[in-house]
């Protein structure tokens, strides 16, 4: 990997050149949980890649040619093909590159992973609402909603009787939902999983994974980024560099 800790490109910057042969490029942002999904899969599969960080508070004009919505992650290969939307980029990488397969071949097992992904889909917007809350009075209601969503995921693990959501070994679904759980400590929301022992064991197991530990972001850095981002600071995306 190259460029993971490089400063982000913003408005007025020159677009990067063609992607070198043998590499795939990911347009990312160091603190973005959606881009982290893609980076986790790249790392887990050992895919040689180049990271170009984008300043999401001051986006380059040329970036909208990579993704009309102006969001990360975006993949670009040496043929100039572009793939965006985090879950789609992850599935593409698993299908297009050799090595460890993260999605099961069995249609039912693959469908089960997609159902868990849908089941977890309320967690990201709840955490975003929590980060953007205007007063502490909103906290208790949001925490209760999170507890309910985590209870649903706890039930999945209870029924499967496995450590991971896809079975006895780590797979795609675990990487897709992990970035949001990594942020619980920074947001002081660990209390929301006090009633979910299997979910806590899953989190402990995830922390031991090489790809997860390689991309771990310290809670204090996440908090500092969140503070700057909420202030609309153009320096938010480059915090700590």
From Swiss-Prot:
Residues reported in the UniProt entry to bind glutathione: 59, 72, 85-86
Entries under SUPFAM superfamilies matching the protein: GST C-terminal domain-like, Thioredoxin-like
Cell location: Cytoplasm, Cytosol
Modification N6-acetyllysine, positions: 57, 143, 148, 152
Tissues in which the UniProt entry reports expression: Most abundant in the liver and skeletal muscle; also expressed in heart, diaphragm, colon, thymus, kidney, lung, ovaries, spleen, intestine and pancreas.
Location of N-acetylserine modifications: 2
One GO cellular component, as annotated: cytosol
Catalyzed reactions: RX + glutathione = an S-substituted glutathione + a halide anion + H(+); L-dehydroascorbate + 2 glutathione = glutathione disulfide + L-ascorbate; methylarsonate + 2 glutathione + H(+) = methylarsonous acid + glutathione disulfide + H2O
InterPro entries, per database record: Glutathione-S-Trfase_C-like, Glutathione-S-Trfase_C_sf, Glutathione_S-Trfase, Glutathione_S-Trfase_N, GST_C, GST_omega, GST_Omega/HSP26, Thioredoxin-like_sf
Entry GO MF terms: glutathione dehydrogenase (ascorbate) activity; glutathione transferase activity; methylarsonate reductase activity; oxidoreductase activity
Family (UniProt): Belongs to the GST superfamily. Omega family.
Complex formation: Homodimer.
Role of this protein: Exhibits glutathione-dependent thiol transferase and dehydroascorbate reductase activities. Has S-(phenacyl)glutathione reductase activity. Also has glutathione S-transferase activity. Participates in the biotransformation of inorganic arsenic and reduces monomethylarsonic acid (MMA) and dimethylarsonic acid.
UniProt protein name: Glutathione S-transferase omega-1
Gene for this chain: GSTO1
């Amino acid at each position: 990997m190259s460029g993971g800790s490089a400063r982000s490109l913003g408005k007025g910057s020159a677009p990067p050149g063609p992607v070198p042969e043998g590499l795939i490029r990911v347009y990312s942002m160091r603190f973005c949980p959606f881009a982290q999904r893609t980076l986790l899969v790249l790392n887990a599969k050992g895919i040689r890649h180049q990271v170009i960080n984008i300043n999401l508070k001051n986006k380059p004009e040329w970036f909208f040619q990579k993704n009309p919505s102006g969001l990360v992650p975006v993949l670009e290969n040496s043929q100039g093909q572009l793939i965006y939307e985090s879950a789609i980029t992850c599935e593409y990488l698993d299908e297009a590159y050799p090595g460890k397969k993260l999605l099961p071949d069995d249609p039912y097992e693959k469908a089960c992973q997609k159902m868990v992904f849908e089941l977890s889909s309320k967690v990201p917007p709840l955490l975003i609402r929590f980060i953007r809350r205007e007063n502490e009075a909103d906290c208790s209601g949001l925490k209760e909603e999170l507890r309910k969503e985590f209870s649903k995921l706890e039930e999945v693990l209870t029924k499967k009787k496995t450590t991971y959501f896809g079975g006895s070994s780590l797979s795609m679904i675990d990487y897709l939902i992990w970035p949001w759980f990594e942020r619980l400590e920074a947001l002081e929301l660990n209390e929301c999983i006090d009633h979910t022992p299997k979910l806590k064991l899953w989190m402990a197991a995830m922390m031991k994974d090489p790809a997860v530990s390689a991309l771990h972001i310290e809670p204090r850095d996440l908090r500092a980024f969140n503070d700057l981002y909420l202030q609309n600071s153009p320096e938010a995306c480059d915090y700590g560099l």
